[in-house]
Amino acid sequence: MVLLLVIIYLAFISLGLPDSLLGSAWPSMYGDLGVSIGSAGIISMIISGGTILSSLLSDRLIRRFGTGLVTFISVAMTAIALMGFSLSGSFIMLCICAVPLGLGAGSVDAALNNFVALHYKAKHMSWLHCFWGIGASIGPIILSYSLIQWKSWNIGYRAISIIQIVLVIVLLISLPLWRKVSSVQSGSDESNQQILSFPELLRLPGAKQVLIAFFCYCAIENTVGLWGSTYLVTVRGVSAETAASWISLYYIGITLGRLLSGFLAIKLRHKQ
């Protein structure tokens, strides 16, 4: 289970890598693409729409194919999408590539969150999202280096895509390990747990409040992540490569907060 947890953490690093790229690269991208600054919102909404859709379908997919295979296919989709981003020279092509990027991100996010919630402790869940922050912090740094060395955002996307491809290979090799864990758990109580529909989930005590809080948090996080670099470049006069590296500090702060929450989870009960 320890080896599998390491693989899960690596998968969440890969999940965070592309999440911070669009906002960091956009000050350099929109001019090359010949579109307005606000067009980043269209790409972001397509990615978010795919993420929401695949998250809602994740329960059926996991029960049909298993967490390991869903994670493998999802990361493969994000790797292909990122390679598409790196080869794109038009806004329409970016919008097309945003579809598999969102679908892949939503599936792997839901699948791994569900798996860790079932098989590990609250501290592991906090640290899981801490590793997402590590990936999100590294993404802008790689992009900044790409802009400094080659004056190209495409190469930054390509580098992240290659990292994703390496993880796809790791996940492919680890598929027997996922099946082994699933076979051990097949006779446990979790296989007999009641499956709730979405309306039934909303009727659970506190569910609506949690959704509202999560919505507000995501709105703040994504707004800063998407537009932070553009603000620094257009309003503060910072260079695009410097702005990209500065945004990584924002994600490092999130990472440290989630690391701390993992230690707090050891001392506090779930309701606290």
Language model segments and positions:
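Symmetry-related core transmembrane helices of the 12-TM Major Facilitator Superfamily/SLC fold
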Residues: 155-176
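Residue-level signature of mid-helix packing/kink "hotspots" within the transmembrane helices
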Residues: 20, 47-56, 137, 251-259
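Extracytoplasmic gate region of multi-pass secondary transporters
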Residues: 22-23, 205-248, 252-255
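Small-residue (Gly/Pro/Ala) motifs that create kinks and tight helix-helix packing interfaces
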Residues: 26, 58, 135-148, 229, ...
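Extracytoplasmic
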Residues: 3-29, 35, 224-229
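Conserved MFS/SLC helix-loop-helix module at the cytosolic interface between two early adjacent transmembrane helices
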Residues: 53-92
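Cytoplasmic helix-loop-helix junction between adjacent transmembrane helices
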Residues: 97-131
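Juxtamembrane intracellular "pre-TM" segments in multi-pass secondary transporters
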Residues: 178-211
